[in-house]
UniProtKB/Swiss-Prot annotation:
HAMAP family the UniProt entry points to: UPF0212
Naturally occurring in which organism (per UniProt): Thermococcus sibiricus (strain DSM 12597 / MM 739)
Name of this chain's protein: UPF0212 protein TSIB_1358
Family statement: Belongs to the UPF0212 family.
Matching Pfam families: DUF555
InterPro entries linked to this entry: UPF0212
Amino acid sequence: MGDYIVVLEAPIIVREVESADDAINVAVSKVAKALNKEKLDFVRVEIGYSQCPVCGSPFESAFVIGNVGLVGIYLTLKVFNAQSLEHAERIAKAVVGKALKKVPLKVFEIKEFHDGKEEGIELNNHKNEF
């Protein structure tokens, strides 16, 4: 049995927004409200980052077209006593999925930790790290 830090990524669609900053604020608020409703206040909510295909520099994953925004969100939580990496992934998706129904969740990263220190297994589905 192991303890893991699991980072999930989720695309959040928001409506009636004017700018990327507005979309980010609404998306974070929407996700935090859904998590708090299910008493999941231990899940950390952060803005996702994308990489510019031209220059390679990272930027916040928020796009607005016609007052509709798409925001990439990272959700981080600790999973205790999981039997394996895959088990930790399933637990994290089940816990967060309970609050964010109909939102596709994908594992961004999983790290095993012992005694509060991260070590060992790491899975990063992105080819470019920031």
